[in-house]
Amino acid sequence: MKVALVYNEKVETLAVVKALEKLLDSRKIEIDPENPDVVITIGGDGTLISGFHKYQNLVDQIRFIGVHTGHLGFYTDWRNFEIGKMVDNLTKKQPSSASYPLLELIITTGSGEKKKLLALNEATIKRVSKTLKADVYIRDQFFESFKGDGLCVSTPTGSTAYSKSLGGAVIHPRLKALQMTEIASINNRVFRTLSSPIVIAPDEWITIKPESDDHYVVTYDGYEFNHKHIKKIEYRISQHVIRFDKYQHTHFWNRVEDAFIGQPKNK
């Protein structure tokens, strides 16, 4: 087995990385950042997202394992003090596998050029200095005319991130669905939106067509794509998935409760 390590530069994280490297070496597990079988991320959910984008060209061939140096995350199964147990499992135990859907964006510019991007959590479109005006289509059928700060399209795993802060629903990651939420929409006689998040089926897609050629910012998992002439953007469930090796199970709704509610455990 060959593994790659992706981590942030925080002091507590670097200490965990150093200890993990020693454990891997003692078990004869090779660290190979170029051609890994498993990518282990150390930090938090943001670090795992960075690891996904670093290795997205290999996403069909690799699996991910997340180590959290703080509270338990949505993508990270192991805490920093459990790395010994994790390495034991790597060498002795057959993992179960969990796969989650990815968001595919196809951006068409005014010149007809196409740019394809992948996102693990979400993608947004905003206008740089003015209100966004755009027509929204579902399965190439007109749905609404939007006016506001922007639009966000998220995956089920991304539903606990930015989308939730916009009033979106939390969606179980086993559901292959996309959710679109509005960012500060303006409703009047010309621009009329549903003013509610929508969830679309796996065989459907969303197309956003900005009204005018202007400078737009498309974000995907915090990364940016800037372009002055975007003709349309298509959002759909990708044919690719991200896969995780699972050696211990934490119920998704337990993670949600721990992250957002934090009820006393004796209830």
UniProtKB/Swiss-Prot annotation:
HAMAP family, alphabetized: NAD_kinase
SUPFAM superfamilies from the UniProt entry: NAD kinase/diacylglycerol kinase-like (SSF111331)
InterPro entries: ATP-NAD_kinase_N, ATP-NAD_kinase_PpnK-typ_C, NAD/diacylglycerol_kinase_sf, NADK
Cellular component, GO annotation: cytoplasm
Biological role stated in the UniProt entry: Involved in the regulation of the intracellular balance of NAD and NADP, and is a key enzyme in the biosynthesis of NADP. Catalyzes specifically the phosphorylation on 2'-hydroxyl of the adenosine moiety of NAD to yield NADP.
Cofactor: a divalent metal cation
The name this protein goes by in its record: NAD kinase
Binding site for NAD(+): D45, G46, N121, E122, K147, D149, T160, A161, Y162, S163, K164, S165, A184
Swiss-Prot/TrEMBL GO biological process terms: NAD metabolic process; NADP biosynthetic process
Pfam families: NAD_kinase (PF01513), NAD_kinase_C (PF20143)
Gene name as annotated: nadK
Entry keywords, A to Z: ATP-binding, Cytoplasm, Kinase, NAD, NADP, Nucleotide-binding, Transferase
Catalyzed chemical reaction(s): NAD(+) + ATP = ADP + NADP(+) + H(+)
Active site: D45 (proton acceptor)
Main localisation: cytoplasm
Family: Belongs to the NAD kinase family.
Molecular function as annotated in GO: ATP binding; metal ion binding; NAD binding; NAD+ kinase activity
Entry EC no(s): 2.7.1.23
Subcellular location: Cytoplasm
